[in-house]
Regions:
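Catalytic cores of carbohydrate-active enzymes across secretory and cytosolic contexts
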Residues: 1-855
Length: 855
């Protein structure tokens, strides 16, 4: 027999993850580590830092990874040391917090979002939308709200940014090791992973479920990157905002359809269903199916029930920022739903179109508006922008009349206030501040704190940031093979005593990061003034598909390398939550320059406010409401030029002028103690008069007061007695819709001729209207609408609506009368409209049937 020289098969590997096992006495550390309570409770994070300072740093503040890497020797040292008592104390505080039961007097909420910014350790966020959602969960926990959240556990999350030496952004996608993250996998009773089966076109997608404990609030994350799925489907939860439009469709289908199926599987049912952006709109498609299949409701009845418990929050100020899907692509994924709902495909897809019956793409936002009873923007100004943006959905009404409201965004103060700041507030303002953050009286005491103490606090935070900038900038420079001698020269130019202005955000072109660099000669004079030194630090990521945003980054990096700007303009790579916390607490001024009104809210400036950092911003988003003279600086909200390039040049000149004549002189009006009393007064005013209005506590309270309670009450009302009111309302709407075209205006007169000279101010006019409803059974209302006309701007704005009084009803005829007296002279337009009336309607847009009639 011939003997082969080699006989071996391929290695057979099994993935295993080795980690340290904690002794029983240290088990509380695991419990604390897997609950994100430690993110905003300093004693928790401090505890892990003390256990192993180097490990804490190398794991980037990940307590789970730290404990898994802890040496046996270090464990024994902890057990033998007084650290054990400290662990027990922190654990006792943690348990006391966690064990508080939810406040059942507040409505329960299911919250859906594509991203959550909770900690840099969990890379399931990209920017402001996610960080806001993360802050919301933290405050819901602190406020003891019965809330659960739904999202995705991304394998790669959002990208890590590095910059080449010439400033070109490089996007790196690094896989997350789920076993080393502060989360737990949801298991079945037999200890095996719970698997959710979601029907996709021609196949089933299998989903694992993970739970992140955000204090008292559970966040359930779906994960398709498992062996049961094809590579194509495993990638559904690979990247946040990655891939093509089909991948986006697959993701939003999973978030909506799969999200509701997951809650059903977990046995979770809430009173309110909150869509954080249109990405989650399809939750209502699955909820409709559930009510039809489980409760025997018709489509229209189910729609009443679903709408009454649903809220849609829009974060996007322009139509182009919303998701639209081609009918073919949308139909591949949602084609079976009309059959489940008992309606036609045309009726179903029209729910996502501004103009039903057209060939428009399916809009997730329009579908959300049609299936959610309430909707809101994220600042007062954005609420107004949203009304104009969504006006085509309700063509019988004008933007200012729409039900679209607003809740101005806020930030979770315990997360974003630096540790030193929180300690300072506790010492100087009292711990009650943390329990009642939106109460201005709790903040007013800052006016009584000595100027010197505030200045010392600000300098402490600034020096920490400067130290970090030096280390991070040097590491990035050397990593990119930059000239070592040059980086030393740059670092030497960084002056801790100089006025430091920060700019950190997503690099979208409308954010106008380039604005400061419009006139480089003027900027060079400003930053090279030896008597009044000033420095700028920039940071931010551009979406990998956004060439314009990446070009802005490259442009700024190139400028920062010029001799006149070395050490004066600094760009830091890889903007994330950790870097954000350092910046918004360490700079002196936070700069924001968006094109108005494209900043829906913006929250980075609010985070700066919590730390006594002053804002210098365009009057847009939250700053439009928040700006207080003597507590920050603002660029005017007035637009001088239609040409954006000219407007940019004017705004840039305004920035330079404000720096030269207000900000820099105020900062450098220093006394013998080395600080400017005027500058400190700005800080005091900012903390006392602005900060309390922009906490997440105030924001959550607003959602409760403006939407959650209202929806919960209505939902309970129409669902009572086997959905009695919902069924009645659906039947009434069906009847009105069927016979709407049958009613006729029999007569419509005014007691005086309005066609010759028009109405006279102060004179009384009487209108009489008779309507014959014919087959229409429901009640009707009528009103006069007066619009003021601005001939220069070619705009109309409603100034008055006057309701006709129903005088009598005879058979199918309705007799109305209106007596009115004009009160304002000028160019006006006057019109009359008829609409259906039912006391069960929450607002007119809920059933927007309108007929305009002619006098």
């Amino acid at each position: 027999m011939k003997i082969k020289a080699n006989n071996a098969n391929s290695p057979i590997w099994k993935d295993v993850y080795s980690h340290s096992k904690l002794p029983q006495q240290l088990e509380p550390l695991n419990e604390i580590a897997t609950n994100l309570w430690w993110v905003w409770n300093h004693e928790g994070a401090k505890l892990f830092g003390k256990i192993d300072k180097q490990l804490w740093k190398s794991t980037e503040g990940n307590p789970v990874q730290l404990l898994q890497s802890l040496s046996h020797k270090r464990m024994e040292e902890i057990l033998a040391d007084k650290e054990l008592a400290e662990i027990q104390k922190v654990y006792a505080d943690f348990k006391a917090y966690i064990n508080v039961k939810p406040d059942k007097t507040q409505p329960s909420v299911a919250y859906f979002s594509m991203e959550y910014g909770l900690t840099n350790v969990l890379k399931i966020y990209s920017g402001g939308l996610g960080v806001l959602a993360g802050d919301y969960l933290k405050e819901a926990s602190d406020s003891n709200i019965d809330l659960c959240a739904v999202g995705f556990l991304y394998r790669y999350g959002y990208f890590t940014q590095t910059l080449s030496m010439d400033g070109q952004q490089i996007a790196n996608y690094e896989p997350q090791n789920f076993n080393a993250l502060p989360l737990t996998q949801v298991l079945q009773s037999n200890g095996e992973p719970m698997v959710l089966e979601v029907p996709y076109p021609g196949r089933t997608v299998y989903v694992h479920i993970w739970k992140v404990s955000v204090g008292r609030v559970p966040l359930y994350l779906m994960d398709t990157d498992i062996p049961q799925n094809s590579e194509w489907d495993r990638s559904i939860t690979h990247q946040l905002y990655g891939g093509d439009w089909e991948n986006r469709m697959k993701q939003e289908y999973l978030l909506g359809i799969g999200g509701i199926m997951m809650l059903n599987k977990l046995g979770i049912k809430k009173q309110i269903y909150h869509c954080n952006e249109g990405h989650a709109a399809l939750i209502n498609a699955q909820r409709l199916v559930d009510y039809i299949q489980n409760d025997g409701l018709s489509f229209n009845q189910a729609l009443e029930v679903v709408r009454a418990s649903a809220l849609y929050t829009v974060h996007t100020p322009v139509p182009a920022g919303h998701d639209y899907f081609d009918e073919g692509l949308f139909g591949r994924y949602m084609g079976e739903f009309p059959g489940k709902l008992g309606i036609s495909w045309q009726d179903f897809i029209d729910m996502g179109r501004e103009n039903p019956g057209s060939n428009e793409k399916f809009s997730m936002s329009v579908f959300a508006l049609n299936t959610c009873q309430e909707a809101n923007g994220v600042s007062w100004l954005h609420g107004k922008v949203s009304q104009r943006m969504f006006a085509p959905v309700w063509k019988g009404y004008f933007p200012d009349e729409l039900h679209v409201g607003y809740v101005t965004n806020g930030v979770h103060m315990p997360t974003w206030a630096a540790t030193e700041v929180k300690k300072f507030y506790a010492d100087k303002l009292g711990t009650k501040l943390f329990e009642d953050q939106s109460n201005r009286k709790c903040w007013e005491g800052i006016q009584n704190v000595s100027d010197e103490e505030i200045w010392n606090l600000r300098m402490t935070l600034k020096n920490k940031l400067i130290d970090y900038i030096r280390v991070q900038y040097k590491d990035s420079w050397l990593k990119n093979q930059g000239d070592p001698s040059k980086v030393v020269s740059i670092l030497e130019k960084i002056n801790p005593n100089a006025l430091l202005i920060g700019f950190g955000r997503r690099f979208a072109t409308y954010k106008r990061a380039h604005l400061l660099f419009t006139d480089l000669d003027r900027l060079a004079k400003i930053v090279n003034n030896e008597k009044f030194p000033i420095q700028f630090v920039f940071t931010g990521k551009a979406h990998p598909a956004d060439g314009g945003g990446q070009g802005l980054i490259k442009h700024i990096v190139e400028i920062s390398r010029r001799p006149e700007f070395l050490g004066k303009i600094i760009f830091l790579e890889n903007y994330d939550m950790r870097l954000a916390r350092r910046l918004i607490s360490g700079v002196d001024v936070w700069l924001n320059t968006p094109t108005r009104p494209l900043e829906a809210s913006g929250t980075s400036g609010e985070k700066a406010e919590m730390n006594g950092v002053l804002n210098f911003s365009v009057l847009d988003g939250w700053w439009y409401e928040g700006y207080v003279e003597g507590a920050g600086w603002a660029l005017t909200d007035k637009r001088t030029y239609e040409n954006q390039q000219y407007q940019d040049q004017l705004d840039a000149a305004t920035i330079y002028h404000c720096l030269e004549t207000e900000i820099i002189p105020t900062y450098y009006a220093k006394n013998s103690k080395g600080y400017s009393p005027d500058w400190i007064q700005y800080i005091k005013n900012s903390i006392a008069k602005i900060a309390p209005d922009y906490t997440m506590k105030r924001m959550l309270d607003d959602y409760e007061d403006r939407f959650y309670h209202k929806l919960a009450t209505r939902s309970a009302h129409i669902s009572a007695n086997n959905y009695e009111i919902a069924k009645q309302l659906a039947a009434w709407k069906e009847e009105v819709a069927q016979h709407w075209d049958s009613f006729q205006v029999e007569s419509f007169t005014c007691d005086q001729d309005l066609t010759v000279n028009g109405p006279v101010v102060g004179k009384e006019y009487n209108f009489n209207l008779v309507i014959d409803r014919h087959e229409l059974q429901g009640m009707l209302g009528a009103e006069m609408v007066v619009m003021k006309e601005d001939p220069e701007k070619h705009t109309l704005s409603p100034i008055n609506t006057a309701q006709f009084e129903l005088m009598k009803e005879e058979g199918s005829k309705l007799f109305f009368k209106l007596t009115t007296t004009p009160s304002e002279a000028g160019n006006h337009k006057m019109g009359f409209r008829v609409y259906p009336v039912n006391k069960e309607l929450p607002h007119r847009m809920d059933f927007a049937y309108v007929r305009w009639i002619q006098l």
